[in-house]
């Protein structure tokens, strides 16, 4: 019972940290660019052009710092997902391997958000300034962000979020049920090996669909787009499995309604 008393709080702490980081990530990627307004040192008249920005050391230093933060997150997220590192962490942390990975990812993302340096004086790729675009573009972006985040949360529920967060591994271990992934079908394991980030399109929508796309936001969107693109490798078998699982879940959801109709 003693190990369980240590394992469960550790897994729950990792989950709480990841949940809080997710809430902060929503603020960082959506609320701040959509509702935060123009920074005090920014504005159309204070911004440099692209050529002038390349000669401004403060802008280049901020972008270089942001790039280092993003690379830190990418290296951590990718390195800890390799088989060698997973084997090492499993040897020393056992069933908490996934929880450790989630906690380290959350901490790396917290570093990115906390120490991110905006470039309000930098050039913009696009900006909705003139009416009616200044009114309708932010509203459209807000709607798309809300829909995207709702889809992201829905997909995480479908994709066994308890296993993704490391909670299910500890729960199964305490009950003596073994490893959760060992109970999944080969088709499901194949899909999970190809798609551990099941929110690619929705996250890209959040990153790119903003009223003003400045240089620091462009850097954030570009690097995450490249990373998400390289991290996915779905093929026709995976798509057929996803389609069959979706149809199965829809049938399960429709059964109570059919019973009530009778």
Swiss-Prot record:
Residues exposed to the Perinuclear space side: 29-58, 115-133, 211-216
Cellular-component GO terms for this entry: nuclear envelope; nuclear inner membrane; nuclear membrane
InterPro entries: Nurim-like (IPR033580)
Highest taxon in the source lineage: Eukaryota
Ranges in the topological domain labelled Nuclear: 1-4, 81-97, 165-191, 235-262
Keyword Translocase: no
Keywords: Membrane, Nucleus, Transmembrane, Transmembrane helix
Compartment annotation: Nucleus inner membrane
Major localization class: nucleus
Membrane topology per record: Multi-pass membrane protein
Transmembrane segments: 5-28, 59-80, 98-114, 134-164, 192-210, 217-234
PANTHER family, sorted: NURIM
Entry's family note: Belongs to the nurim family.
Protein name (record): Nurim
The organism's taxonomic lineage, starting at the top: Eukaryota, Metazoa, Chordata, Craniata, Vertebrata
